[in-house]
């Protein structure tokens, strides 16, 4: 455009434009520290560089700052200046010993602050000043032993606070004053012995509280009373031992209660009073022995109940009566149950899953009622006999009456019954009964001498019925018989049958045939169950393989569109402000023990063009 005569003005214009462009790019080009691995202006990665202090001259447009894995002992108020757009600051695993008050005062748009896995021993008031928009604060795996009152005063927007695995022993009055937006509080794996009655003041919006693995000896019911919105409470791994009356008063919205491995031996009558909306209760790994009608009488909406790995030996018939319409899952495995009356389970009309394995079941007549109830129920429950030894390992559903009642009749015990003043027999009747035993009984094969005795309950044996029929006809003519031992040279085994006297040869042959048929049917049933199990496993394997193939195809299809999954995207969205939010409580039963860190969601709000452009980002590990 410029000729030779205008070369000097053109040169001046060129220099002016160049200087202007350099000024515009100054913050992007010259603002990044040369020691950092990645500096895009939006994201700065200074991970694992052994830095002893925070570098200077970061661009003001920085959104992510990664300082993980360094050797930064102290953070003062002059090190994090000018970062007005910073959203996430990672200072974890950096050997931090102390953070000075007002160290984050200029980070007014900070949403996520990671100070976990350091050596911070104390938190002084003013340390979080200026963090009015902070949502998530991570302080786990430090050495904090005490939190002074008011230290969290400035965190009015924090919804998630993680203080697990510190050295806290006492939560004093007003520890969390000012945290009116807090929804999740994790205090697990500390040494907390006592919680002040006003320790949770201002936490009316708290939804999830994790106090597992501390040293609480009783439920701090007075401290819980202010937590009107609490939905999930974990007290597992505390030496509580007993649930005192009204331990959970005020927690009307509580739905999930974890009391695993808390040495609980007793639940008082009103122990669960006030939590009528409870849905999930976990009492695994405790020392409960007896369950009665008062234990769970107030939990009318309970859906999920785990009682495995206790020492339960008895359950009253009406223990689960009030939760019959709601309870769907019940776990009674790994206890000391030997019998269970069907009336215990009959009220549970909504039950879909029952576990009772690994109990020392005694397969006798007491379990026949349970077997019959299970046969008519839609619930699948595998109970295997532990006693008697002859039935060990056999499934309850294969046990029938012939296996349950088989006994020998001993004459010596019959004489003990005869000795009773209420029972008298004619000598003639006794001899007739003895003649019937020796003539119509089982073949006499053994020539050894032994004592033959009868059951105590004479009416249940044919010989006893014979005595009664002949002895009580004319009680005035009866003669008392002295109890003496009768020595016989044969052993007599009398099998009890329902509608017959002592078996004759024909009855004996019929009984043997019936027993053989029963055993064959049992073997066929067992074989069928084994084949059915293999078939189900094969179907599951086929479905799993199909699922994996479909998943693999989806991955291949996704890889065609993008070679690499990225968590952050740049320069694809118009100027806007994006609000970062996180889901509060995961309600999956599998996540009850510890709070999972939820995936972050972003909601876009359009702003005028003259405001600073903020990138859209996703972060799956916050």
Curated annotation (Swiss-Prot):
It is a single-pass membrane protein. The chain crosses the membrane at residues 527-547. Keywords: Glycoprotein, Leucine-rich repeat, Membrane, Repeat, Signal, Transmembrane, Transmembrane helix. Residues 1-31 form the signal peptide. Residues 32-60 form the LRRNT domain. One of its GO terms (cellular component) is plasma membrane. Pfam families: LRR_5, LRR_8. LRR repeats lie at residues 61-82, 85-106, 109-130, 133-154, 157-178, 181-202, 205-226, 229-250, 253-274, 277-298, 301-322, 326-347. Residues 359-406 form the LRRCT domain. The keyword Nucleotidyltransferase does not apply. Expressed at low levels in many tissues, including smooth muscle, brain, uterus, pancreas, cartilage, adipose, spleen and testis. It is found in: Membrane. The keyword Heme does not apply. One of its GO terms (biological process) is positive regulation of response to cytokine stimulus. Glycans are attached at residues 215, 266, 331, 400. SMART domains: LRR_SD22, LRR_TYP, LRRCT. Renders cells highly sensitive to the activation by cytokines and lipopolysaccharide (LPS). This is Leucine-rich repeat-containing protein 70. It comes from Homo sapiens (Human).
